[in-house]
From Swiss-Prot:
One of its GO terms (molecular function) is hydrolase activity, acting on ester bonds. SUPFAM superfamilies: SGNH hydrolase. Keywords: Hydrolase, Lipid degradation, Lipid metabolism, Secreted, Signal. This is GDSL esterase/lipase At2g40250. The active site is at 43 (nucleophile), 337, 340. Pfam families: Lipase_GDSL (PF00657).
Amino acid sequence: MNRNQHKPMFVTFLINILLLQLLNLTNASPSPPITALYAFGDSTVDSGNNNYIPTLFQSNHPPYGKSFPSKLSTGRFSDGKLATDFIVSSLGLKPTLPAYLNPSVKPVDLLTGVSFASAGGGLDDRTAKSSLTITMDKQWSYFEEALGKMKSLVGDSETNRVIKNAVFVISAGTNDMIFNVYDHVLGSLISVSDYQDSLLTKVEVFVQRLYEAGARRITIAGLPPIGCLPVQVTLTSINTPRIFHHRICTEHQNDDSRVYNQKLQKLIFGLSQRFRGSKVLYLDIYSPLIDMIKHPRKYGLEETLRGCCGTGLLEAGPLCQPLSRTCDDVSKYLFFDSVHPSQTAYSVIASFALQKLFPLL
């Protein structure tokens, strides 16, 4: 038989396969509604847990919270809401994501999510220990404690359903790189690549813990452009005139962030293959932040490499105080202090995640 005679049959076969796949997609049941959001990590998702521990890494004082409802200084390292607050509100879960250690949080509140995160912490427990904040191991212990409270309230079956359909957010790594590589005396002795690999191993272990606890929707944030954080711009230009004028990002640190994020995405792909029935996804924060830096006018921003608090060069936490001068219009600033994004920036990050990531969950 002529080889060309097989072509129509083969094409028909392919079309039938494609039609079957489309039919399966059409008939596939939609993902169950998201029941809750639980956050682990550092200041990017800490709703105020550090208010209840003895550490200098606190922001429960003005001018923090100046854009928050009632201008409350809740312990969030921003002028207002974090990305996780915008997300839980958009999902219809609650107005904002509370801190687990907040005494006002009741067992029923745990059913729709809380933050276990701690500003100053990291994937490497040594980071949190050096800043006297809550390690990832301790955050995990708090999560197990919360599970017990939930089971006492609604039983094992309902708790398991909540956990299975909840979104888990891990956002950490920036402090690890800054404290242990860039701004540490031992940094020159550490291979950046090797240290990144050690952090990713910790991510893998934590995700496995979540999976074994019943989590099936897990998102892991990559690193931001660390070299564009105002404090890093300042510290790497301390001896040059550009400390005040013509400030530019520290590109080798941004390069490190991009490499880490590539490694993280590779790890996440492997975890997705390994943990069948789960959705482990990469939460890209680098792209929206660098886009705001490169195209500020698109977002109504005017200042992207200085914070709103004080000089905007070094102030954060205890250095950003009630008497600190603040900018006239924080909505035009990408960063509120020298490290942490403003509410405006967090709103953009949340919108980016809700558009690009959450439809996949």
